[in-house]
């Protein structure tokens, strides 16, 4: 989720299944710093669970703004729910002509056909290859792809969650 800078977070985690070495359920609340696209004090809620009875390996992202909300889940990967306050909900379809060029640029097989892991990895490799080719020319643009910094941020986030949970779900600064 672009431009999201964490100020502090609080995490609670536990195991519901007896004998599990790792926790199987966690909740995280994150307070965000202000930025160009994020209001200071906005919050992000994250629930990670392997005990959600009846659900498959379900991943959902919901972004709630002051005027509209977006929701995507991996059970319906070609659709995004778009809700504007005071208007009917809309379902945006992958590959549709009403989307921006930026949204359609990596749509390889057109709407109506499910994309998969192959295409996702291919998109990442293509972005990385363009960045490497430009770096060889001495051009260092602003390319989007997960890099070492993104990996380090992921590890830092997990460490901060564990720190918070180990302190009785205390708020911990992210910096």
Language model segments and positions:
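Amphipathic alpha-helical blocks and their helix-capping loop/short-beta junctions
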Residues: 86, 97-106
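Contiguous beta-strand/loop segments that form the cofactor/metal-binding neighborhood of enzyme cores
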Residues: 1-87, 95, 114, 120-139, ...
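C-terminal lid/capping helical subdomain adjacent to the catalytic/cofactor pocket in oxidative enzymes
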Residues: 148-153, 164-175
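Short glycine/proline- and acidic residue-enriched helix-loop micro-motifs
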Residues: 106-113
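Nucleotide-sugar-dependent glycosyltransferase catalytic core
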Residues: 90
């Amino acid at each position: 989720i672009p431009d999201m800078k964490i100020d502090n977070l609080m995490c609670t985690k536990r195991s519901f299944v007896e004998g599990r070495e790792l926790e199987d359920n966690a909740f995280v609340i994150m307070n965000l710093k202000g930025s160009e696209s994020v209001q200071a004090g906005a919050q992000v809620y994250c629930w990670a669970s392997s005990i959600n009875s009846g659900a498959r390996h379900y991943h959902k992202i919901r972004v709630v703004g002051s005027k509209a909300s977006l929701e995507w889940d991996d059970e319906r990967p070609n659709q995004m729910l778009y809700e504007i306050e005071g208007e009917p909900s809309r379902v945006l379809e992958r590959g549709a002509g009403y989307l921006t060029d930026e949204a359609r640029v990596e749509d390889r097989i057109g709407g109506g056909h499910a994309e998969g892991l192959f295409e996702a990895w291919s998109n990442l490799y293509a972005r990385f290859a363009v960045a490497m080719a430009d770096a060889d020319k001495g051009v260092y643009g602003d390319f989007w792809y997960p890099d070492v910094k993104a990996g380090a941020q992921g590890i830092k986030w997990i460490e901060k969650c564990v720190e918070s949970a180990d302190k009785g779900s205390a708020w911990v600064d992210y910096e």
